[in-house]
A protein has these predicted regions:
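N-terminal intrinsically disordered, cationic/polar leader segments
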Residues: 1-94, 104, 108-133
Length: 133
């Protein structure tokens, strides 16, 4: 179970309009950069973008997750997973869970409901690596 450390590099939250809106759709995207190997760990950049329709507010969070495997076997498995070009689902959930309090606070300050839906997992469920925060 690898250890995860997070670094938030940038937070931007902006409200464009204060008009009353009957229906508000909130879209959230989590995007990951290409993993970098550093000594015995991996560095993976991420960007979380939250936008509203109609456009009345937006939130952007940029950061980095540092994944430190406990064993050489975990390091090898993670390296293979990243070579496939996919981000492990437990890592997506860990990034979302870490940033959810920040997103909730910013949403409250902007006066919009927080996007609390968990990211969807692909239909294939593979046995993988569990992560520890």
């Amino acid at each position: 179970m690898p250890n995860l450390s997070f670094r938030i590099d940038s937070i931007r939250a902006e409200r464009y309009s204060f008009e009353a809106i009957q229906q508000l759709n909130i879209n959230m995207n989590i995007m990951f950069g290409k993993p970098e190997k550093r000594e015995n760990s991996f560095l993976v950049g991420f960007v979380i973008k939250i936008d509203c329709t109609p456009p009345m507010a937006s939130i952007d969070i940029k950061g980095l997750v540092i994944i430190t495997p406990i064993s050489q076997d975990e390091y090898t498995k993670l390296g293979e997973e990243f070579k496939k070009g996919s981000v492990p689902y437990p890592l997506i959930i860990a990034v979302y869970s870490y940033n959810l309090p920040i997103i909730t606070l910013l949403s409250r300050e902007l006066g919009i409901p927080p996007p609390i839906q968990l990211p969807m997992q692909s239909s294939q469920h593979e046995k993988g690596i569990n992560y520890h925060l």
